[in-house]
């Protein structure tokens, strides 16, 4: 089969299953609105949970950083791309989250892939929550280690897998807050099972950091758990992009030597690192923002009980409405867009078959009347 025939067949198959993805050019978005060429929408698809992407102090910090350092890092951190701004941010993150070391990566995807690829060998084993993020599962599947999956958020299932002998090391992998369902992992129980067997726990807290725990330290801090490896990302509550790996000094040194995603990637611009340092300060003092976000979550859940859709067991900013049918989820999304509301449909393979949904996300920037408008639109569609 030639290349064109292969691509045509795959694209036709994707179109026929109501799973076709499209990008749309937008002018800008924030925690409340999305601005497109055809107008302004209420934005219920943003991960900008605290509204920090438009924070004046963070914008100013980036501008000052660009004036001081220029707009790019110029190379890998192993060559020319590691500046004082990067070093200060790493130390700030380590001090804040209670770890000896932090290492910056260009994205959460890169951090998850880089850590797993560097640590695991063919004698090792990865045991992951079956609903873990694609970056974690792909890294595990591509690594030489054996992959086993435990039932979602069930420590008993994990314990059964851990009881099976492994020649090498075992790494248990989960998310702190799950990106598609919004539910929280029982981290204390998972960590206890992991430690009993002398293994390591790696937690991706992309959707917990900034919004959970004291000073926004995340779901691990909230549950009084300190995993051996903690991944935090900056594309959600921080309002920017990038990620960091928190770990002990020996592990950090190992990753500096062996994590190819770190070694061979151009590091984030120093101006971005400086902006992230300001974002950390905003998060640390952001109790009012977190309180406002929680009020919006509570209000949404009260109102959504009246809708003919299934809610997940989520107390976080991620509040999916399970529609099940792929075509219906797309129709709902399009109907909402016609009414000035931006909510995207999430379908397989991002979520399991039969669980298509509207992935609604709430932020501290939303107002109660915004949620009322969303509810009215959803009721109108069903009627």
Swiss-Prot record:
Reactions this protein catalyses: 6-carboxyhexanoyl-[ACP] + L-alanine + H(+) = (8S)-8-amino-7-oxononanoate + holo-[ACP] + CO2
Q: Does the keyword Transferase apply?
A: yes
Report the top EC class in one word: transferase
Q: Which cofactor does it need?
A: pyridoxal 5'-phosphate
| UniProt entry keywords in alphabetical sequence | Biotin biosynthesis, Pyridoxal phosphate, Transferase
What EC number(s) has UniProt assigned to this enzyme? 2.3.1.47
Q: Does the keyword tRNA-binding apply?
A: no
Please give the Gene Ontology molecular function terms for this protein: 8-amino-7-oxononanoate synthase activity; pyridoxal phosphate binding
User: Which residues are listed for pyridoxal 5'-phosphate binding in this entry?
Assistant: 108-109, 179, 207, 233
Q: Which Gene3D superfamilies match?
A: Aspartate Aminotransferase, domain 1, Type I PLP-dependent aspartate aminotransferase-like (Major domain)
Pathway where this protein functions: Cofactor biosynthesis; biotin biosynthesis
> Which InterPro entries does this entry report, sorted A to Z?
Aminotrans_II_pyridoxalP_BS, Aminotransferase_I/II_large, AON_synthase_class-II, AONS_Archaea/Proteobacteria, AONS_Proteobacteria, PyrdxlP-dep_Trfase, PyrdxlP-dep_Trfase_major, PyrdxlP-dep_Trfase_small
Any idea which positions bind substrate?
21, 133, 350
Sequence positions bearing N6-(pyridoxal phosphate)lysine: 236
> What processes in GO biological process is this protein linked to?
biotin biosynthetic process
Chain's role: Catalyzes the decarboxylative condensation of pimeloyl-[acyl-carrier protein] and L-alanine to produce 8-amino-7-oxononanoate (AON), [acyl-carrier protein], and carbon dioxide.
Give the family, as the similarity comment puts it. Belongs to the class-II pyridoxal-phosphate-dependent aminotransferase family. BioF subfamily.
Question: Subunit composition?
Answer: Homodimer.
Q: Which PANTHER family match?
A: 8-AMINO-7-OXONONANOATE SYNTHASE, CLASS II AMINOTRANSFERASE/8-AMINO-7-OXONONANOATE SYNTHASE
Q: What is this protein called?
A: 8-amino-7-oxononanoate synthase
Q: Which organism is it from?
A: Photorhabdus laumondii subsp. laumondii (strain DSM 15139 / CIP 105565 / TT01) (Photorhabdus luminescens subsp. laumondii)
What lineage is on file?
Answer: Bacteria, Pseudomonadati, Pseudomonadota, Gammaproteobacteria, Enterobacterales
